[in-house]
Each structure stands twice: as C-alpha cells, then as structure tokens.
Amino acid sequence: MSDNVPTIAAVATAPGRGGVGVIRISGKNLLPMAQALCGKTPEPRVATYADFTDADGQAIDSGLLLFFAAPASFTGEDVIELQGHGGPVVMEMLLNRCLELGARLAEPGEFTKRAFLNDKLDLAQAEGVADLIDASGRSAARLALRSLKGDFSRRIHGLVEGLITLRMLVEAALDFPEEDIDFLEAADARGKLDGLRRAVDDVLANAQQGAILREGLNVVLVGAPNVGKSSLLNALAGDEVAIVTDIAGTTRDAVRERILIDGVPVHIVDTAGLRETDDVVERIGIERSRKAVSEADVALVLVDPREGLNEKTRMILDTLPSDLKRIEIHSKSDLHAHAAGGFGTGAETVIALSAKTGDGLDALKRTLLCEAGWQGESEGLFLARTRHVNALKAAQEELSLAALCGNHQIELFAEHLRLAQVACGEITGEFTADDLLGVIFSRFCIGK
C-alpha cells in the first residue's frame, strides 16, 4: 500500500449499549496518537489501563488500550484498540477524539481490505471474515471459520501451483519448437491435465455445497386465495408470522421468513395473490410478489384437491417462469382423502400436507433440501459464494477445452491453462478488478 494511506478509526462493537465498547484505529506511526489518548507510551501487545482524555486533558472514559505494532497486526499497520464502557455516548466521544487527532472514519470493511492489500490474508479469507459474522447457523459458522483459516485458499493455491507447473512444461515446448520432441507426451502433460481436472471438479463440488449453506434456497408459496399458503408459512416457521383468516385475499403484501433446515437457510415468501387489481396498496404487494417469484429457486404450488386446478390457480401458473422448479402441495390433507397423482402444475413432486397437524412437513423439508442440492455437512467443506462457484466453473471449462487440443495446438493449450489460472486467481484476489473489491468490502460492517 502507499505511504500516504490515512489513519482510520471506527467503533468495532455492535451499536447500542453493552458492557464493553471497542474503538479500532489503524494507520502508520500511531504511538503519538496513543500517547495523546492515554498519556502513556504503550508496549506492543500489552494491555495498558489508562484514562482516555479529550484535548483539555479531561477524562472521557477509563479502560484498556492495546497497541499492535506493524506488521504484526490484523491490518499489517499499527493498530490501536480502545476498550471502554459500551455506552453509545462514550463511544461517540472517544471516536470523535480519534478524529480530532487526525484519523478519518473508516469505510465499511476497510480494516479487512487493508489486511488484504497488505497480504495478511487473501480475498477468500477476507470474505470468510464477513461470512463468519453473518453466519445464519452453526454449520455456516463452522465452515466460514474454515475459509477464514485458509482451508479454501489452500485448495485454490494447490490448483494454481499445478497449473503453473503444467504451464512451465508447455512453455518449454513453445521455446524449443525446432526440437523433434513431443513435449506434451514426454512430460505426461495429458496425465497432469487429467489430474488437474479431477482436482477442480472436487473443489467445485465442495464450493457448491458451501454456497448452498451460505446463500440457501429461495422459495415462493403460490396458489389461489385461501388455499393455505399463510398457514403453511406459519407451520414451516414455527410461529405466527402471517395472518390467517377464512377471508380470501388476507395477504396483501409479500411476507418473508427465513428458516433453517439441517443448517441450510431457506428464504420463504408467502406471495400476495398474483392477479390484477385496482387497489394501489395491494398492487404494490403483488409487484413485490412477482419480484420474489423472479428470484425464486423453487415454487410451492398449493392446490386444494377438493377443488383441483381451478381457473385462479391456472392464471397464477401462467405467470411463473417456465424453468422454475415446482413442488405441488395438496393442502389441508386433514380434511380430505389423499388425491392420486398431481393436477398438471408442472411439478415433478407431489406432497400431501396439513399445516394444521404437521403431517407431510418433514417430507416437504427433505424435498426442499434435495432441490437445493444439499448433501449434508462433511469433512473438508468450506463456506463459499456464488462468485467462487462461477470462477471454478470457468476454470473447469478452460481445462475441458485444453483437453480437446491436439498435439500440434500447443499455443492454444497454453492459453486455456493461463485462463484457468486467471479464473482460480480471481477467488483469492490474485487477479481481481478493483471495482469487484469495492463491492465485496462495501458489504462488510463498519469497524471490520
């Protein structure tokens, strides 16, 4: 990083009241600031108890000051942490004092971004920091910690090293074209390529599972009014999150709820009736429902077998994307005999279910996990993101194209290897555009 990087400061603890509040500061040559804050010269990595004072020497608070000298710190710069009482007024006064002493307010994720730019961690590890903070369940937290500790990165670095080794062999063939030697055959380049393809496939499979655990499954409930959508949402959530009445059309806005099934987050939207209306408020709810449908992975199509596929349900089905996966739910199974087969909703799976008794809920949950592609937590999994999966798919494609190259297409073979390496490098940040970095770190919380 440049020598002209400004000092940054932010509250590192969550907003609100608490027993302890932490101010984090990062920059160059912070000992003078530490002395101005507490009147003492702190030793690195030793907790210093002191009064934190304002410009007039009046105490703002008392607590611990921790000093981490560069480069042995999270960001790779000098870092100060002020640990005081966790009241919002105290935190604001301490932060303002830091700003008076020359710091500026940190941007979201800026501490972690500096750690990345100073080679304290790579991009996949940096994302692991945010994913650990945002983990939706225990499984996600465990896998995010593995990514933060570098498990995912080591797998990627292994792929990159293999690609570099193979590229060196290919470059040798390009450097000595006059030699009557089949370099690719002599160096077993084909065998090495096959090994790399298997390794990419393995990492991709793990990344896809990690992405499911991080990002979950988007599900919409659709069906005619009063068919039991809100009752099903409440049953899945285990709480009264949606209003249930005998009056058709009670739900006038999309109701969203997140549940965990075997640690996998499932984002469920109970849609307002997908129909035309002159009611302004209801129209807004319907537009939100249509947006939820466009973003969904699975639609639960609720049908009352006593009525079958009525005209209202047919109209709703016509609004669904043709490629959207569907599960047909025969609702209110406690009130009727199970119907044989489906009603032509386009669903491959039919489940009879009663939101009132809970009959069929477990079968629905298992089916949702199957639709998500979740295979269960296993050793070696790590949390991943969609961008990681896409990068690995790109590398997989380039290696597949390399395998199609003939023995006299060495330059094309080498180019596919290079592009596969670039795709892998995008995951760890070796080859990453600045605008993508901005997007990634802007989604962090301030102070991290």
Curated annotation (Swiss-Prot):
Binding-site residues, GTP: 226-231, 245-251, 270-273
Compartment list: Cytoplasm
Manner of cofactor binding, per the entry note: Binds 1 potassium ion per subunit.
Assembly mode: Homodimer. Heterotetramer of two MnmE and two MnmG subunits.
Binding site residues for K(+): 226, 245, 247, 250
Function: Exhibits a very high intrinsic GTPase hydrolysis rate. Involved in the addition of a carboxymethylaminomethyl (cmnm) group at the wobble position (U34) of certain tRNAs, forming tRNA-cmnm(5)s(2)U34.
A biological-process GO annotation: tRNA wobble uridine modification
Keywords attached to this entry: Cytoplasm, GTP-binding, Hydrolase, Magnesium, Metal-binding, Nucleotide-binding, Potassium, tRNA processing
Keyword Magnesium among UniProt keywords: yes
Binding residues for (6S)-5-formyl-5,6,7,8-tetrahydrofolate: 24, 81, 120, 448
InterPro entries xrefs: G_TrmE, GTP-bd, GTP-bd_TrmE_N, GTPase_MnmE, MnmE_dom2, MnmE_helical, P-loop_NTPase, Small_GTP-bd
Enzyme class at the top of the EC tree: hydrolase
Record-annotated TrmE-type G domain positions: 216-373
Entry EC no(s): 3.6.-.-
Pfam families in the cross-refs: MMR_HSR1, MnmE_helical, TrmE_N
Protein name from the UniProt record: tRNA modification GTPase MnmE
GO CC terms of this entry: cytosol
